[in-house]
Protein backbone atom coordinates (compact mmCIF):
# COMPACT_ATOMS: atom_id res chain seq x y z
CA UNK A 1 0.00 0.00 0.00
CA UNK A 2 1.28 3.47 -0.88
CA UNK A 3 1.28 5.96 1.96
CA UNK A 4 -0.40 9.26 1.16
CA UNK A 5 2.30 11.83 1.87
CA UNK A 6 2.32 14.99 -0.25
CA UNK A 7 5.78 16.23 -1.10
CA UNK A 8 6.64 19.54 0.57
CA UNK A 9 6.57 22.40 -1.91
CA UNK A 10 9.28 25.01 -1.59
CA UNK A 11 7.91 28.58 -1.42
CA UNK A 12 10.26 29.76 -4.18
CA UNK A 13 10.76 27.02 -6.77
CA UNK A 14 14.27 27.10 -8.15
CA UNK A 15 15.95 28.09 -4.87
CA UNK A 16 18.56 25.69 -3.40
CA UNK A 17 17.68 23.94 -0.14
CA UNK A 18 19.95 22.95 2.74
CA UNK A 19 18.37 20.28 4.98
CA UNK A 20 19.27 20.11 8.68
CA UNK A 21 19.95 16.37 8.91
CA UNK A 22 20.34 14.77 12.34
CA UNK A 23 19.72 11.26 11.03
CA UNK A 24 16.56 10.88 13.11
CA UNK A 25 13.18 9.87 11.73
CA UNK A 26 11.92 13.37 10.97
CA UNK A 27 14.92 14.75 9.10
CA UNK A 28 15.46 11.44 7.29
CA UNK A 29 11.92 11.59 5.90
CA UNK A 30 12.30 15.24 4.92
CA UNK A 31 15.62 14.71 3.15
CA UNK A 32 14.38 11.58 1.38
CA UNK A 33 11.22 13.43 0.31
CA UNK A 34 13.14 16.33 -1.20
CA UNK A 35 15.71 14.02 -2.79
CA UNK A 36 12.82 12.25 -4.56
CA UNK A 37 11.94 15.46 -6.40
CA UNK A 38 14.04 15.74 -9.59
CA UNK A 39 13.40 19.47 -9.95
CA UNK A 40 14.75 20.16 -6.47
CA UNK A 41 17.90 18.19 -7.23
CA UNK A 42 18.39 20.30 -10.35
CA UNK A 43 18.06 23.56 -8.42
CA UNK A 44 20.20 22.38 -5.51
CA UNK A 45 19.79 20.07 -2.53
CA UNK A 46 22.38 19.65 0.22
CA UNK A 47 22.34 18.55 3.86
CA UNK A 48 24.14 19.63 7.01
CA UNK A 49 24.81 17.44 10.05
CA UNK A 50 25.85 18.98 13.36
CA UNK A 51 28.33 16.99 15.45
CA UNK A 52 27.84 18.37 18.97
CA UNK A 53 30.37 16.06 20.60
CA UNK A 54 28.02 15.50 23.54
CA UNK A 55 26.86 11.91 22.98
CA UNK A 56 28.96 8.75 23.02
CA UNK A 57 27.47 7.76 19.65
CA UNK A 58 28.03 11.14 17.97
CA UNK A 59 30.70 9.75 15.62
CA UNK A 60 28.47 6.83 14.64
CA UNK A 61 25.59 9.21 13.93
CA UNK A 62 27.82 11.29 11.69
CA UNK A 63 28.91 8.17 9.81
CA UNK A 64 25.26 7.11 9.40
CA UNK A 65 24.33 10.49 7.92
CA UNK A 66 27.33 10.42 5.60
CA UNK A 67 26.38 6.95 4.36
CA UNK A 68 22.77 8.00 3.73
CA UNK A 69 23.85 11.04 1.73
CA UNK A 70 26.39 9.03 -0.24
CA UNK A 71 23.70 6.46 -1.08
CA UNK A 72 21.36 9.20 -2.32
CA UNK A 73 24.01 11.38 -4.01
CA UNK A 74 23.49 14.35 -1.68
CA UNK A 75 26.33 16.64 -0.65
CA UNK A 76 26.70 16.62 3.15
CA UNK A 77 28.25 19.38 5.26
CA UNK A 78 29.51 18.12 8.62
CA UNK A 79 29.84 20.88 11.23
CA UNK A 80 31.68 20.02 14.44
CA UNK A 81 30.70 22.56 17.08
CA UNK A 82 31.87 23.35 20.58
CA UNK A 83 29.07 23.44 23.14
CA UNK A 84 29.96 25.47 26.20
CA UNK A 85 29.15 23.87 29.56
CA UNK A 86 29.58 27.23 31.30
CA UNK A 87 27.46 29.55 29.18
CA UNK A 88 24.91 30.09 31.93
CA UNK A 89 22.03 29.09 29.63
CA UNK A 90 22.02 25.32 30.20
CA UNK A 91 23.52 22.59 28.04
CA UNK A 92 20.45 22.12 25.82
CA UNK A 93 20.20 25.85 25.07
CA UNK A 94 23.96 26.11 24.52
CA UNK A 95 23.78 23.24 22.00
CA UNK A 96 20.92 24.99 20.22
CA UNK A 97 22.93 28.23 20.05
CA UNK A 98 25.96 26.42 18.62
CA UNK A 99 23.77 24.57 16.14
CA UNK A 100 22.10 27.74 14.85
CA UNK A 101 25.49 29.42 14.48
CA UNK A 102 26.69 26.52 12.32
CA UNK A 103 23.53 26.68 10.22
CA UNK A 104 23.93 30.43 9.74
CA UNK A 105 27.57 30.01 8.73
CA UNK A 106 26.76 27.37 6.11
CA UNK A 107 23.53 28.77 4.65
CA UNK A 108 24.22 30.76 1.50
CA UNK A 109 22.52 33.99 0.48
CA UNK A 110 18.89 33.51 -0.52
CA UNK A 111 18.89 29.75 0.12
CA UNK A 112 16.46 27.82 2.33
CA UNK A 113 17.38 25.93 5.49
CA UNK A 114 14.78 23.14 5.85
CA UNK A 115 13.97 21.84 9.33
CA UNK A 116 11.87 18.72 9.91
CA UNK A 117 9.60 19.94 12.72
CA UNK A 118 6.16 18.37 12.42
CA UNK A 119 2.67 18.84 13.86
CA UNK A 120 3.47 17.01 17.11
CA UNK A 121 6.53 19.23 17.63
CA UNK A 122 4.34 22.27 17.08
CA UNK A 123 1.87 21.11 19.74
CA UNK A 124 4.72 20.55 22.22
CA UNK A 125 6.14 23.98 21.48
CA UNK A 126 2.75 25.63 21.98
CA UNK A 127 2.32 23.95 25.37
CA UNK A 128 5.85 24.88 26.47
CA UNK A 129 5.33 28.53 25.51
CA UNK A 130 1.94 28.61 27.23
CA UNK A 131 3.42 27.18 30.44
CA UNK A 132 6.18 29.82 30.33
CA UNK A 133 3.66 32.64 29.99
CA UNK A 134 4.85 33.75 26.56
CA UNK A 135 2.10 35.56 24.66
CA UNK A 136 3.80 36.06 21.29
CA UNK A 137 5.41 32.66 21.84
CA UNK A 138 2.02 31.02 21.38
CA UNK A 139 2.62 31.48 17.66
CA UNK A 140 5.14 28.66 18.23
CA UNK A 141 7.11 27.76 15.09
CA UNK A 142 6.50 29.61 11.83
CA UNK A 143 6.50 27.71 8.52
CA UNK A 144 8.78 30.31 6.94
CA UNK A 145 10.96 32.96 8.59
CA UNK A 146 14.05 34.98 7.66
CA UNK A 147 17.24 33.38 8.94
CA UNK A 148 20.86 34.47 8.52
CA UNK A 149 21.47 35.10 4.81
CA UNK A 150 18.39 33.17 3.70
CA UNK A 151 15.21 31.66 5.11
CA UNK A 152 14.25 28.99 7.60
CA UNK A 153 11.61 26.64 6.19
CA UNK A 154 9.54 24.06 8.10
CA UNK A 155 7.58 22.17 5.43
CA UNK A 156 6.28 19.36 7.68
CA UNK A 157 4.32 21.37 10.25
CA UNK A 158 1.02 20.06 8.85
CA UNK A 159 2.18 16.42 9.04
CA UNK A 160 1.98 14.23 12.14
CA UNK A 161 4.79 12.05 13.39
CA UNK A 162 2.60 9.03 12.61
CA UNK A 163 2.51 10.08 8.95
CA UNK A 164 6.28 10.43 8.89
CA UNK A 165 6.68 6.99 10.46
CA UNK A 166 4.34 5.41 7.89
CA UNK A 167 6.33 7.00 5.08
CA UNK A 168 9.68 5.87 6.49
CA UNK A 169 8.48 2.29 6.90
CA UNK A 170 6.98 2.16 3.42
CA UNK A 171 10.25 3.48 1.93
CA UNK A 172 12.33 1.09 4.08
CA UNK A 173 14.34 3.95 5.55
CA UNK A 174 16.78 3.56 8.43
CA UNK A 175 17.11 6.26 11.05
CA UNK A 176 18.79 7.01 14.35
CA UNK A 177 17.01 6.68 17.69
CA UNK A 178 18.50 9.19 20.14
CA UNK A 179 18.25 7.83 23.69
CA UNK A 180 18.23 11.40 25.06
CA UNK A 181 14.71 11.78 23.66
CA UNK A 182 13.54 9.61 26.57
CA UNK A 183 15.24 11.75 29.21
CA UNK A 184 12.40 13.14 31.33
CA UNK A 185 14.61 15.89 32.73
CA UNK A 186 13.86 17.77 29.52
CA UNK A 187 10.46 19.49 29.53
CA UNK A 188 9.72 18.68 25.90
CA UNK A 189 10.31 14.97 26.48
CA UNK A 190 8.02 15.01 29.53
CA UNK A 191 5.24 16.59 27.48
CA UNK A 192 5.68 14.15 24.61
CA UNK A 193 5.88 11.01 26.77
CA UNK A 194 3.39 11.78 29.55
CA UNK A 195 1.22 14.82 28.85
CA UNK A 196 0.24 14.59 25.18
CA UNK A 197 -0.75 10.88 25.32
CA UNK A 198 -3.03 11.72 28.25
CA UNK A 199 -4.58 14.59 26.30
CA UNK A 200 -5.12 12.30 23.31
CA UNK A 201 -7.04 9.84 25.46
CA UNK A 202 -9.61 12.52 26.19
CA UNK A 203 -9.30 14.62 23.03
CA UNK A 204 -7.96 12.54 20.10
CA UNK A 205 -7.45 15.66 17.97
CA UNK A 206 -5.48 17.50 20.67
CA UNK A 207 -2.25 17.73 18.68
CA UNK A 208 -3.97 19.12 15.59
CA UNK A 209 -6.00 21.59 17.67
CA UNK A 210 -2.91 22.88 19.51
CA UNK A 211 -1.07 23.26 16.22
CA UNK A 212 -4.05 25.15 14.80
CA UNK A 213 -3.99 27.43 17.85
CA UNK A 214 -0.37 28.18 17.03
CA UNK A 215 -1.32 29.18 13.49
CA UNK A 216 -4.10 31.47 14.78
CA UNK A 217 -1.74 33.02 17.33
CA UNK A 218 0.80 33.60 14.56
CA UNK A 219 -1.78 35.43 12.46
CA UNK A 220 -2.77 37.64 15.40
CA UNK A 221 0.87 38.29 16.29
CA UNK A 222 1.55 39.35 12.70
CA UNK A 223 -1.21 41.97 12.92
CA UNK A 224 0.11 43.33 16.22
CA UNK A 225 3.69 43.29 14.97
CA UNK A 226 2.65 45.31 11.93
CA UNK A 227 1.10 47.93 14.22
CA UNK A 228 4.26 47.99 16.37
CA UNK A 229 6.38 48.53 13.26
CA UNK A 230 4.31 51.60 12.35
CA UNK A 231 4.40 53.11 15.85
CA UNK A 232 8.00 52.42 16.87
CA UNK A 233 9.88 54.81 14.51
CA UNK A 234 8.03 57.79 15.99
CA UNK A 235 9.42 56.90 19.43
CA UNK A 236 13.09 56.75 18.41
CA UNK A 237 15.68 59.50 18.25
CA UNK A 238 18.43 59.44 15.56
CA UNK A 239 20.67 57.30 17.80
CA UNK A 240 17.96 54.68 18.31
CA UNK A 241 17.17 55.66 21.90
CA UNK A 242 13.53 55.48 23.04
CA UNK A 243 11.71 58.70 23.94
CA UNK A 244 10.09 58.13 27.35
CA UNK A 245 7.38 60.77 26.93
CA UNK A 246 6.36 59.32 23.57
CA UNK A 247 6.40 55.79 24.99
CA UNK A 248 4.27 56.63 28.05
CA UNK A 249 1.62 58.19 25.80
CA UNK A 250 0.64 54.60 24.95
CA UNK A 251 -1.25 52.23 27.30
CA UNK A 252 0.80 49.69 29.30
CA UNK A 253 0.01 46.71 27.06
CA UNK A 254 1.20 48.59 23.98
CA UNK A 255 4.27 49.88 25.85
CA UNK A 256 5.28 46.30 26.61
CA UNK A 257 4.99 45.38 22.94
CA UNK A 258 6.93 48.47 21.83
CA UNK A 259 9.72 47.75 24.31
CA UNK A 260 10.06 44.22 22.98
CA UNK A 261 9.90 45.42 19.37
CA UNK A 262 12.61 47.99 20.13
CA UNK A 263 14.88 45.29 21.56
CA UNK A 264 14.25 42.98 18.62
CA UNK A 265 14.90 45.76 16.10
CA UNK A 266 18.25 46.50 17.77
CA UNK A 267 19.27 42.83 17.76
CA UNK A 268 19.13 42.53 21.55
CA UNK A 269 18.03 39.33 23.34
CA UNK A 270 14.27 38.99 23.91
CA UNK A 271 13.15 41.24 26.76
CA UNK A 272 11.73 39.07 29.59
CA UNK A 273 8.49 39.85 31.39
CA UNK A 274 10.34 40.86 34.56
CA UNK A 275 12.26 43.39 32.47
CA UNK A 276 9.04 45.01 31.30
CA UNK A 277 7.84 45.14 34.91
CA UNK A 278 11.08 46.73 36.18
CA UNK A 279 11.06 49.31 33.38
CA UNK A 280 7.46 50.24 34.21
CA UNK A 281 8.07 50.33 37.96
CA UNK A 282 11.58 51.82 38.20
CA UNK A 283 12.90 53.28 34.93
CA UNK A 284 9.94 55.17 33.48
CA UNK A 285 9.02 57.09 36.67
CA UNK A 286 12.67 57.70 37.71
CA UNK A 287 14.12 61.18 38.23
CA UNK A 288 15.68 63.12 35.35
CA UNK A 289 19.21 62.45 36.65
CA UNK A 290 18.54 58.81 37.52
CA UNK A 291 20.96 56.05 36.51
CA UNK A 292 18.23 53.38 36.69
CA UNK A 293 19.08 50.24 34.74
CA UNK A 294 17.76 46.77 33.91
CA UNK A 295 20.29 44.06 33.00
CA UNK A 296 19.70 40.70 31.30
CA UNK A 297 21.72 38.42 29.00
CA UNK A 298 24.77 40.74 28.93
CA UNK A 299 22.53 43.60 27.82
CA UNK A 300 21.32 46.72 29.62
CA UNK A 301 18.45 49.15 29.27
CA UNK A 302 19.42 52.44 30.91
CA UNK A 303 17.44 55.60 31.53
CA UNK A 304 19.10 58.97 30.95
CA UNK A 305 17.52 62.36 30.22
CA UNK A 306 14.03 61.19 29.25
CA UNK A 307 15.44 58.46 27.03
CA UNK A 308 15.85 54.70 27.31
CA UNK A 309 19.09 53.34 25.87
CA UNK A 310 20.07 49.81 24.89
CA UNK A 311 23.65 49.11 25.84
CA UNK A 312 25.96 46.09 25.77
CA UNK A 313 28.58 46.54 28.52
CA UNK A 314 32.21 46.03 27.57
CA UNK A 315 35.28 45.55 29.78
CA UNK A 316 37.31 48.72 30.41
CA UNK A 317 40.17 49.47 28.07
CA UNK A 318 43.66 48.43 29.26
CA UNK A 319 45.09 51.37 31.24
CA UNK A 320 48.37 51.24 29.33
CA UNK A 321 46.71 51.23 25.89
CA UNK A 322 47.80 54.45 24.14
CA UNK A 323 49.18 53.72 20.66
CA UNK A 324 50.51 56.28 18.22
CA UNK A 325 48.30 56.68 15.14
CA UNK A 326 49.41 58.06 11.78
CA UNK A 327 45.85 58.43 10.45
CA UNK A 328 46.73 56.74 7.15
CA UNK A 329 44.99 53.47 8.03
CA UNK A 330 42.11 52.85 10.48
CA UNK A 331 43.03 52.31 14.13
CA UNK A 332 41.33 49.31 15.75
CA UNK A 333 40.19 50.07 19.29
CA UNK A 334 40.19 47.62 22.24
CA UNK A 335 36.39 47.20 22.05
CA UNK A 336 36.55 46.24 18.36
CA UNK A 337 35.54 49.67 17.10
CA UNK A 338 37.80 51.92 15.08
CA UNK A 339 38.97 55.45 14.39
CA UNK A 340 39.60 56.48 10.81
CA UNK A 341 39.97 59.51 8.61
CA UNK A 342 37.45 59.86 5.80
CA UNK A 343 38.19 61.88 2.67
CA UNK A 344 35.35 64.12 1.50
CA UNK A 345 36.58 64.09 -2.11
CA UNK A 346 37.70 60.44 -2.30
CA UNK A 347 41.41 61.28 -2.46
CA UNK A 348 44.01 59.23 -0.63
CA UNK A 349 44.07 59.98 3.09
CA UNK A 350 47.36 61.83 3.76
CA UNK A 351 47.71 61.10 7.48
CA UNK A 352 48.62 63.52 10.25
CA UNK A 353 51.76 65.68 10.12
CA UNK A 354 53.12 63.45 12.90
CA UNK A 355 51.71 60.44 14.80
CA UNK A 356 49.15 61.27 17.47
CA UNK A 357 48.38 59.35 20.66
CA UNK A 358 45.02 57.67 21.22
CA UNK A 359 43.94 56.73 24.74
CA UNK A 360 40.95 56.32 27.03
CA UNK A 361 39.65 59.04 29.33
CA UNK A 362 41.29 59.37 32.72
CA UNK A 363 39.37 62.33 34.09
CA UNK A 364 40.23 66.00 34.33
CA UNK A 365 40.78 66.51 30.58
CA UNK A 366 40.05 69.88 28.98
CA UNK A 367 39.44 70.87 25.35
CA UNK A 368 39.40 74.14 23.39
CA UNK A 369 36.44 74.30 21.00
CA UNK A 370 36.58 76.23 17.71
CA UNK A 371 35.80 79.90 18.26
CA UNK A 372 36.74 79.74 21.94
CA UNK A 373 39.81 81.26 23.57
CA UNK A 374 39.93 79.07 26.66
CA UNK A 375 39.45 75.41 27.44
CA UNK A 376 36.46 73.71 29.04
CA UNK A 377 36.28 70.52 31.12
CA UNK A 378 35.69 67.62 28.73
CA UNK A 379 33.18 66.12 31.16
CA UNK A 380 30.96 69.22 30.93
CA UNK A 381 31.24 69.40 27.14
CA UNK A 382 30.16 65.77 26.79
CA UNK A 383 27.23 66.41 29.12
CA UNK A 384 26.22 69.46 27.10
CA UNK A 385 26.01 67.53 23.82
CA UNK A 386 24.07 64.66 25.44
CA UNK A 387 26.59 61.82 25.43
CA UNK A 388 25.38 59.22 27.99
CA UNK A 389 27.80 58.59 30.88
CA UNK A 390 28.49 54.94 30.00
CA UNK A 391 29.47 55.87 26.45
CA UNK A 392 31.91 58.52 27.61
CA UNK A 393 33.96 55.84 29.37
CA UNK A 394 34.77 54.11 26.06
CA UNK A 395 35.25 57.27 24.01
CA UNK A 396 38.76 57.42 22.46
CA UNK A 397 40.72 60.62 22.97
CA UNK A 398 43.03 61.83 20.20
CA UNK A 399 45.96 63.67 21.77
CA UNK A 400 49.02 65.63 20.69
CA UNK A 401 51.15 65.35 23.78
CA UNK A 402 48.99 66.68 26.62
CA UNK A 403 46.64 68.56 24.28
CA UNK A 404 43.26 66.89 23.64
CA UNK A 405 42.40 67.19 19.95
CA UNK A 406 39.22 65.07 19.82
CA UNK A 407 36.84 63.02 21.93
CA UNK A 408 35.61 60.36 19.52
CA UNK A 409 34.15 62.27 16.60
CA UNK A 410 31.72 64.21 18.79
CA UNK A 411 34.05 66.97 20.03
CA UNK A 412 36.92 68.35 17.97
CA UNK A 413 39.44 70.93 19.16
CA UNK A 414 40.11 74.04 17.08
CA UNK A 415 43.55 72.96 15.71
CA UNK A 416 42.20 69.62 14.49
CA UNK A 417 39.14 71.24 12.87
CA UNK A 418 41.41 73.61 10.95
CA UNK A 419 43.68 70.78 9.75
CA UNK A 420 40.77 68.51 8.75
CA UNK A 421 39.10 71.31 6.81
CA UNK A 422 42.32 72.14 4.96
CA UNK A 423 42.75 68.51 3.87
CA UNK A 424 39.04 67.85 3.22
CA UNK A 425 38.93 65.11 5.81
CA UNK A 426 36.54 63.99 8.53
CA UNK A 427 37.36 62.07 11.70
CA UNK A 428 35.08 59.07 12.20
CA UNK A 429 34.60 56.92 15.29
CA UNK A 430 32.82 53.59 14.89
CA UNK A 431 32.18 52.00 18.26
CA UNK A 432 31.16 48.40 18.95
CA UNK A 433 30.21 49.53 22.43
CA UNK A 434 27.50 51.72 21.00
CA UNK A 435 24.76 53.59 22.80
CA UNK A 436 22.16 51.43 21.08
CA UNK A 437 23.07 47.92 20.04
From Swiss-Prot:
Residues annotated as transmembrane: none
InterPro entries the record matches: Lysidine-tRNA-synth_C, Rossmann-like_a/b/a_fold, TilS/TtcA_N, tRNA_Ile_lys_synt, tRNA_Ile_lys_synt_N, tRNA_Ile_lys_synt_subst-bd
EC number per UniProt: 6.3.4.19
UniProt keywords, alphabetically: ATP-binding, Cytoplasm, Ligase, Nucleotide-binding, tRNA processing
SUPFAM superfamilies referenced in this protein's UniProt entry, alphabetically: Adenine nucleotide alpha hydrolases-like, MesJ substrate recognition domain-like, PheT/TilS domain
Catalytic activity annotation: cytidine(34) in tRNA(Ile2) + L-lysine + ATP = lysidine(34) in tRNA(Ile2) + AMP + diphosphate + H(+)
Places the protein is found: Cytoplasm
Pfam families the UniProt entry points to: ATP_bind_3, TilS, TilS_C
Entries under CDD domains matching the protein: TilS_N
Main location, first listed in the record: cytoplasm
An example Gene Ontology molecular-function term: ATP binding
Gene Ontology cellular component terms for the protein in this record: cytoplasm
Residues bound to ATP: 22-27
Family: Belongs to the tRNA(Ile)-lysidine synthase family.
UniProt note: domains: The N-terminal region contains the highly conserved SGGXDS motif, predicted to be a P-loop motif involved in ATP binding.
Role description: Ligates lysine onto the cytidine present at position 34 of the AUA codon-specific tRNA(Ile) that contains the anticodon CAU, in an ATP-dependent manner. Cytidine is converted to lysidine, thus changing the amino acid specificity of the tRNA from methionine to isoleucine.
Name used for this protein in its record: tRNA(Ile)-lysidine synthase
Species in which this protein is naturally found: Xylella fastidiosa (strain 9a5c)
Gene assigned in the entry: tilS
Amino acid sequence: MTVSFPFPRIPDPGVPVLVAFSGGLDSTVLLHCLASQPTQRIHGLEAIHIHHGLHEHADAWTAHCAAFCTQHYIRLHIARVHVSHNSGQGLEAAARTARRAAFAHTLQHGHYLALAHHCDDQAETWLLRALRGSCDGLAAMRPLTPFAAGHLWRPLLTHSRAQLLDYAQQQHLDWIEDSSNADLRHDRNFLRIHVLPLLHQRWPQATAVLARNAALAAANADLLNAEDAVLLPDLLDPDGALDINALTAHPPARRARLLRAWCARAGAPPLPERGVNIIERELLPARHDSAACFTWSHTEIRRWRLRLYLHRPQPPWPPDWQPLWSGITPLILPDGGQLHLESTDHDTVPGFPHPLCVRARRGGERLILPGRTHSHPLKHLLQDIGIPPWRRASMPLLCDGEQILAAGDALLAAPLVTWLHAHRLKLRWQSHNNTCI
